[in-house]
Amino acid sequence: MTSHKDPAWLDNAVFYEIYPQSFNDTNADGIGDINGIIEKLGYIQELGCNAIWLNPCFKSPFGDAGYDVEDYCTVAPRYGTNEDLVELFREVHARGMHILLDLVPGHTAVTHKWFKESMKAARNEFTDRYVWTDSIWEEPQGMGCIRGISDRDGSCAVNFFSHQPALNYGFYKPDPAKKWQQPMDAEGPLATREALKDIMRFWLSAGADGFRVDMAGSLVKNDEDGQGTVALWQDIRAFLDREFPAAAMVSEWGEPDKSLIGGFHMDFLLHFGPSHYNDLFRCAQPYFSRRGKGSAAEFVAAYRRSMAKTDGRGLICIPSGNHDMDRLARNLDTDELRVAFAFLLTMPGAPFIYYGDEIGMRYVEGLTSVEGGYGRTGSRSPMQWDKGLNAGFSSASAEKLYIPLDPAADRPDACAQMCDEGSLRSEVKRLIAFRQDNPALQSRGGMEFITDGADGGALVYRRTGGSQTIYAVINPAGTPAQIPQIPAGGRVLYSIGGYTYDGALTVEGGSAVFVEA
């Protein structure tokens, strides 16, 4: 489904994820805004990122930080206006960059007009827009529900929080005894699908380059193997190919063998699902810790399986993090982060850098939940731009800030690191440039793991592109390692940490070395 129609710009895309409310505040209300993003596009471009993933910016009651949408076609006033967002599109494109919006197709806010109409007892256009049972006494099995708040007799399924009613895309295997379980081709589910296409059409026509799709694998119910949801996305892919063939699609699915067949260009390996992503950075003994007690072996095995199943189709992406994960710096120090970024920025697929990870922003401990963040709130604190008032994020009083800043006196900031060639940000910038300068390291370059990083050992992989071959040696553990797999006579292109290479390669602990051979 994704071959010659893949947008060419994905071949060398490096994404920067922006959580808008925490990025840059230009009107002193303590909340980041679209004009603040426009103001900082130069910073993103100077880092080397050429694409943006913008988290939800649509009208919302913000019970889940914007992942509870009240109006898909209106920008939330706290961020600005639709015109501001279109201006952001223009400014991004003027720099030769691209931008994806965050699309939440599985549920809405309870304040959405669709849900208000759906709650009415009298049948109407939106009666079947959500998954409702036929009786308030019957709960949708395996899903939470909303009930007792409507004139309508029934319980409405929810997807995540209890205020996020599930939109009705149908059931792949409806239970004949439960008439409320509508098949995918019933009138209600098809109308929901068309409404989703209308939303996509609206923003693509306005200048968006595509979408990152929230919970993309969860739309069709009673769909254990995902085949119904795959078919739904194939239909949407066909619509995009007809009307917006350049639109890029990335899924939050975590199973590339399904999402890429479904028509997405990219999927993530994430903190949920079968990827073992957490083994690398976010567990009791992460592989990228210098303690050397972690292992990348199960991650490598899962990655190999995904590669085999997708057979070269689409891109498999490994993000530095996102708004739902602990910050990388919660488990890794600066030197460990350097080696982690050397891995992240030399793997196939498009890299995604979560705002602030490039400077080693920390998880802020002990925060009270903000807008449904709960344990995720500490990863959503304001971007630290400089050493000025509120770290340069906002001129508002500290108590007005959306989320409190990292209170540490030594918190990292972008300005200081941009002036320091030895900083983490400078390393990340060099690594992005290294990636872009070498065809073998591009998103679609060839990939073969030579070792699997078992038991804290070095991870070795070979990247190929055109006539170029690069061997990557990633050795996070604090002990040296001999790497017999690297051919003699090669040329070291980039290194973090020490090494000797006189016919055989030996790397120091906490190192990353890249050899062209």
List PLM regions with ranges.
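Beta-sheet entry/capping signal
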Residues: 50-51, 96-98, 200, 209-212, ...
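Active-site groove signature of glycoside hydrolases
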Residues: 199-222, 318-325
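Acidic/aromatic-lined carbohydrate-recognition and catalytic surfaces
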Residues: 2-191, 205, 216-264, 383, ...
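Beta-strand-rich binding/interaction modules
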Residues: 479-497
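Conserved alpha/beta catalytic core and glycan-binding cleft of carbohydrate-active enzymes
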Residues: 110-146, 233, 237-382, 387
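Aromatic/hydrophobic pocket-lining residues that form the small-molecule binding cavity
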Residues: 37, 85, 196, 229, ...
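Loop/helix patches that line or flank the sugar-binding groove of alpha-linked glycan CAZymes
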Residues: 10-11, 243, 255, 260-263, ...
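C-terminal beta-strand-rich structural cap/linker in extracellular carbohydrate-active enzymes
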Residues: 501-517
